[in-house]
Amino acid sequence: MKYLIVGLGNIGGEYNGTRHNVGFRMVNALAEDGGVQFVEARYGAIAHMRVKNAELILLKPNTYMNLSGNAVRYWMQQENIPREQVLVLVDDLALPFGTLRLKPKGSDAGHNGLKNIAEVMGSIDYARLRFGLGDEFSKGRQVDFVLGRFTPEEEEKLPELTKHAVEIIKSFCLAGIQRTMNRYN
């Protein structure tokens, strides 16, 4: 079976390492685990890998966060991947830092990337793996927080957290969403 694994983030060097780009960080960790490299393609950088009998198409949209839906739709159509086999990797302010939560569907929770994907797909019925950023910011400073860098203490924990995310992604593809949620949520 084929799966589309989409890491959300903003393109451009100024966004590398920011909290909002943790989706890119997770999909990069998956590519590294699979020993594959991304190549530039239409609407983003793409990598192909296998995990046992599952074929994974990894995508880092180059459309900016708020237009991610165009890239997702294009690659779903290009690779003939149904919505049930799409997993979007995304940051989440509502979860404490480092919390990983797999969801089968849901609202955009104020995330513009998820909002655009839902608009373009015409549905909120697609899986997402949310990476908790926490809410350690002053009122009105949300944008600065998500576009800011992780603290040194957080950065120290990221390798282990992204490794855990890779396990969840692989389980999603091999065992299905329900079993994976039961095991990891």
Curated annotation (Swiss-Prot):
Q: Which GO terms describe its molecular function?
A: peptidyl-tRNA hydrolase activity; tRNA binding
Q: Where is this site: Stabilizes the basic form of H active site to accept a proton?
A: 91
Q: Where is this site: Discriminates between blocked and unblocked aminoacyl-tRNA?
A: 10
Catalysed reaction, written as an equation: an N-acyl-L-alpha-aminoacyl-tRNA + H2O = an N-acyl-L-amino acid + a tRNA + H(+)
In the record, biological process GO terms are: protein quality control for misfolded or incompletely synthesized proteins; rescue of stalled ribosome
The record's keywords, sorted A to Z, are:
Cytoplasm, Hydrolase, RNA-binding, tRNA-binding
| Active-site residues, record numbering mapped to chain | 20
- InterPro entries, from UniProt? Pept_tRNA_hydro, Pept_tRNA_hydro_CS, Pept_tRNA_hydro_sf
Q: Which domain of life does this protein belong to? A: Bacteria
Summary of the function given for this chain in its UniProt record: Hydrolyzes ribosome-free peptidyl-tRNAs (with 1 or more amino acids incorporated), which drop off the ribosome during protein synthesis, or as a result of ribosome stalling. Catalyzes the release of premature peptidyl moieties from peptidyl-tRNA molecules trapped in stalled 50S ribosomal subunits, and thus maintains levels of free tRNAs and 50S ribosomes.
How it assembles, according to the record, is: Monomer.
- Can you name this protein? Peptidyl-tRNA hydrolase
